[in-house]
Amino acid sequence: MPYTVRANDQGNVRVVCPATEREYAPEELVASILRKLVDDASTYLGEPVEAAVITVPAYFNDAQRQATRDAGRLAGISVERILNEPTAAALAYGFDRSTVKRVLVFDLGGGTFDVSVLRIAQGVFDVKATSGDTQLGGNDWDRRIVDWLADAFQAEHSIDLRRDRQALQRLTEAAEKAKIELSGVQSTPISLPFIATGADGPLHIETTLERSVFESLCPDLLDRLLRPVQRALRDSGLAAEDIDDVVLVGGSTRMPMVQQMVRTLIPLEPCQSVNPDEVVAIGAAVQAGILTGELRDLMLNDVTPLSLGLETIGGVMKVLIPRNTPIPVRKSDVFSTSEPNQSSVEVHVLQGERQMAEGNKSLGRFRLSGIPPAPRGVPQVQVSFDIDANGLLQVSATDRTTGRQQSVSIQGGSNLSEEEIKQLIEEAEQKATEDRRRKAEIDRRNRALTLVAQAERRLRDAADRKSTRLNSSHVS
């Protein structure tokens, strides 16, 4: 990555940008992209876009979903729904509503991988199971080519190109280009002139990558794709032969090795009638139509991708909401104190599939105080988990004796506090006003320059015509 990524004083991620001489939270960077999309859409539609459906990888945890919602707020839009990408893809395809279909959606993007199993009948889309890997995507295939090129170059010239940022960027671009080309041909040339300088002058890369060689570099990546598919099928209670349709989503599914792996696992020809790069956006538009009431004959029932629970005595995770539970959902359980006369309890909210708390994602902590003195195990504290249709979690704890309650919307994984979000929104609004003013000035200046240029051109044309008439009169 050409930018420095570090942790600030609170341990949150910050990206250092030398050009602007400031640090950015990931939410700010995503907000910039969303703002550009909103501006382009508003220009195209001729009216302001104020709300949106945003898709995310199905295996995003609560913290990542909350960060996505925060990015939408920073961009100045109301996030009406956060939709899982495989579910969006299924909505885009629609499928025949006269029959019951069991569909597997295989979504391999640039940086994440998701797989979902749905039951579709009479316009009702029921997500039965979802699985995935948020650290696996097409970029991993790119890196295999980068390493192949860099290792060969280092063996020949004793120079590691991965230590040079500019050289690494060129390698990465060439690797992605080669990966894309190998989806349609058996071999592709790779040319990188002046990639480095040796003792005798400039050095170059001139080589050819065969598809078979590329595939030999990636067997472990295919294995990592296989496991989530098997898990999703197992969680849905279906076998591979029970699947009626397979939908491929994401540009990385164009790789022949990926398509062949899917065919081997599920002996069906995948549906490819919609562009895999566009199908998720189309599904998001369908979901927006459902929310606005323009599409009344469709219903979507999604699930939570990971188990949710809290830490109990001994560091064990107690699951309240198992993975693949349909959402929205509310689940409660009763807990007690671990010490005599304990006046407060800390609720540590977790997400993940490990039995021990330390192996799972910590979403946040809060404390319920004011518990009356009592022997260990006597007080009763009811803890409730609420997940909304966006997959976002709210947790509450209530002392049954006093009725005292403490609740919190989990934001433990967000990189921005509520105060920071409000400040950034105000800054964005101020900058938006300034940007509009500057754009208006530039537009006026450009129009003036255009008018001046047109006037000068007309004057020249008039002078040329007058000169031509004078010359004609002189000749005659």
What are these regions (language model features)?
Residues 1-11, 16-27, 32, 39-469, ...:
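Oxyanion-binding/catalytic loops of NTP- or PPi-dependent enzymes
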